[in-house]
Design a protein with these regions (language model features):
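A structural signal for multi-pass alpha-helical bundles of membrane permease subunits
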Residues: 12-280
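Short, Lys/Arg-rich, polar N-terminal cytosolic tail immediately upstream
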Residues: 1-9
Length: 280
């Protein structure tokens, strides 16, 4: 047996140990949140945070949805509605813009694209105040329209990702469609979009996760309890009730579960998006 063959099992074992340790470190905060949410406030205050709940109680989850402290059910529904509307707008407008930048010929196309892409370097906090003033002048403060409007018309990252994928589609396919009499819209809808379903699915997942976790804009543009989303509703529990951590962790657990389900179901698509962005 050569030295290389002897060290291979040790290297594999070391890699496995590192991966297990990384997985445990990643899951530890979520596990601690779940355990804390199943404790009564008295038990949490009198025992170690790492102790198991004894007895197990779901009172914190019942409190979330009974409306006595915060209308978490409405926040959950509003978050879902916000994500669906933003997702639809982002996909529609990003696909159209990306196709124009990838396939259509017009003066200044590449310059306009790179100028648009350069806005990725602008931190989001820089545009918050101008966006807020625009929404106030339009009378959209503390409305659902004001909550979703700034994100409806696509994003530079989405346009970039789709444009790079569209450019990789063989031009022979779109040329053949035009020869058969298909116009721009028909070529886009019947040729390009069906071939781009993997990257569109990836973009949809990223959009859902990003906007379900959006905190700063909902906090600024809305007030009161009527238009609270999951992030702002969870944050309000900390100051309003002197940081009842068992209730807060129950809220964070409920907020995380849908996103974790989406990530676990479509994690391969998320990895594919990174590969597509890197190789194209």
């Amino acid at each position: 047996m050569t030295s290389a063959s002897r060290t291979r099992p040790l290297a594999d074992a070391g890699t496995y140990v590192v991966q297990v340790a990384a997985a445990l470190l990643t899951l530890a905060p979520f596990a601690l949140s779940v355990l804390t949410s199943l404790k009564a406030p008295v038990q949490f205050a009198s025992t170690s945070p790492l102790s198991l709940p004894n007895p197990v109680t779901v009172e914190n989850y019942l409190t979330l949805f009974d409306g006595s402290r915060v209308d978490f059910g409405s926040a959950l529904g509003l978050t879902a509605a916000m994500v669906v509307v933003v997702l639809a707008g982002q996909l529609v407008f990003s696909i159209m813009a990306a196709y124009a930048f990838a396939r259509l010929e017009f003066p200044g196309r590449d310059l306009l694209f790179w100028v648009y892409l350069a806005t990725l370097m602008v931190p989001p906090v820089v545009t918050v105040v101008p966006l807020y003033l625009m929404m106030v002048q339009l009378g959209l403060r503390n409305t659902f329209s004001g909550l979703v409007l700034p994100y409806l018309l696509g994003s530079p990252y989405a346009v970039f990702l789709l444009r790079e994928f569209f450019r990789g589609i063989p031009s022979e396919l779109t040329d053949a469609a035009r020869i058969d009499g298909a116009g721009t819209w028909r070529t886009l809808l019947h040729i390009v979009v069906p071939l781009s379903r993997p990257v569109i699915a990836t973009l949809a997942i990223i959009t859902v996760v990003t906007h379900a976790n959006n905190f700063l804009w909902p906090l600024i543009i809305t007030s009161g309890d009527e238009l609270q989303v999951l992030t702002t509703a969870t944050a309000s529990l900390q100051g309003r009730f002197n940081a009842n951590w068992t209730l807060v962790t129950a809220a964070t657990t409920v907020a995380m579960l849908p996103l974790m389900a989406v990530f676990l179901a479509f994690s391969r698509r998320i990895v594919d998006s990174i590969q597509i962005t890197g190789f194209r």
